[in-house]
């Protein structure tokens, strides 16, 4: 079945975002006291079973958690990749577009305010450089004027990020299996023996398979505080409320002033998305990594794990005069991986799913060249 024939399956996940246009949730401000809404999990203080349990509780109840002292990705790795990212965005826009042209079908290259969220129907106030881990996607998109070190460091950083993402997925799947076995007895145990290993369905740089993506993001400063306030009144966001398409996202944030603004729905399990508030996600802990569950993994686990809405609000006060930088590593299953559907629904491949979500997010752009290949 083609991606177009399967589009209604993708639409079910996009629908949550689209409803924000009329629900009023997208305009709500964040809770003043939301520090405890997103769990912080310290790898250094936990044994394996307790780590699995804490990760699963956070993933199933909030869909967001922050890792400290996590393996594979060190603070120095994050800082070094941010240095390359910031150098990339310092270049003239025309140079970025020429050196790294965006291709929606390949989900790779440089884009400037192209992403239109279903939740706002407005363009996000950002620019980004997307690296999808496939040689054919990147062969004409690595910025030659930045030298070979940019590509080499980015590949290494993506490799370390994937190892951490796979570890998180394995922990979550192991704990889910443990809990289902405890609830279901011997029959459930036999069923779980046949359950597929989701973590193993992720690769880098394998042609016609790999879909994992690193997105380096720059939210440009505004010319004045008043300009940011005016755009906020018109409904603009730095990134409109959305869920991610992947299995898990590793989000790397700068700690300096002006780099805040990331928020997630605070109590979606309790209140539903239509009635929840927003919770601020801390960005000030050096070396910390924010993780959220994506739609793929939520669908693969029949909704046991929560893919939570999140957004980047418009800056307030003097924040508006600062750039905001972040990086997101999207652990997306290989093209041929079949995403198990909810009971009674069809399955689809990870390739079909990603193409469907690209259409939903870039279909609103007026740039026909962007969408022609999708």
Regions of interest found by a model, annotated:
Residues 2-374:
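Peripheral, non-catalytic segments flanking oxidoreductase cores
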């Amino acid at each position: 079945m083609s991606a177009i024939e399967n589009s209604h399956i993708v639409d079910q996940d996009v629908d949550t975002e689209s409803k924000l246009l009329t629900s009023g949730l997208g305009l709500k401000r964040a809770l003043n006291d939301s520090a405890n809404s997103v769990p912080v999990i310290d790898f250094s203080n936990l044994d394996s079973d307790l780590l699995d349990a804490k990760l699963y509780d956070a993933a199933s109840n909030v869909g967001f958690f922050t890792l400290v002292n996590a393996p594979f990705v060190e603070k120095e790795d994050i800082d070094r990749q941010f240095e390359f990212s910031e150098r990339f965005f310092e270049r003239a826009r025309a140079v970025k577009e020429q050196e790294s042209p965006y291709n929606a079908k390949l989900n790779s290259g440089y884009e400037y305010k192209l992403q239109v969220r279903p939740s706002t129907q407005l363009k996000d106030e950002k620019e980004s450089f997307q690296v999808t881990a496939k040689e054919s996607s990147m062969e004409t998109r690595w910025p030659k004027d930045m030298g070979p070190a940019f590509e080499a460091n980015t590949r290494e950083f993506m490799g370390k990020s994937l190892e951490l993402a796979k570890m998180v997925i394995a922990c979550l799947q192991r704990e889910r299996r443990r809990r289902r076995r405890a609830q279901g007895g011997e029959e459930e145990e036999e069923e779980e023996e046949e359950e597929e290993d989701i973590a193993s369905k992720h690769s880098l740089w394998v042609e016609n398979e790999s879909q994992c993506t690193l997105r380096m993001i720059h939210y440009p400063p505004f010319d004045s505080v008043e300009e940011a306030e005016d755009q906020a009144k018109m409904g603009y966001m730095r990134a409109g409320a959305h869920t991610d398409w992947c299995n898990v996202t590793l989000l790397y944030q700068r700690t300096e002033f002006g780099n805040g603004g990331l928020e997630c729905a605070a109590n979606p399990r309790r209140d539903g998305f239509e009635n929840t508030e927003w919770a601020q996600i801390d960005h000030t802990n050096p070396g910390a990594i924010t993780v959220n569950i994506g739609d793929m993994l939520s669908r693969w686990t029949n909704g046991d794990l929560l893919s939570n809405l999140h957004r980047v609000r418009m800056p307030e006060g003097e924040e508006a005069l600062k750039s905001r930088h972040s990086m997101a590593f999207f652990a997306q299953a290989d093209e041929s991986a079949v995403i198990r559907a909810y009971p009674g629904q069809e399955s689809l491949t990870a390739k079909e799913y990603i193409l469907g979500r690209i259409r939903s997010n870039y279909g609103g752009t007026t740039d026909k060249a962007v969408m022609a290949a999708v």
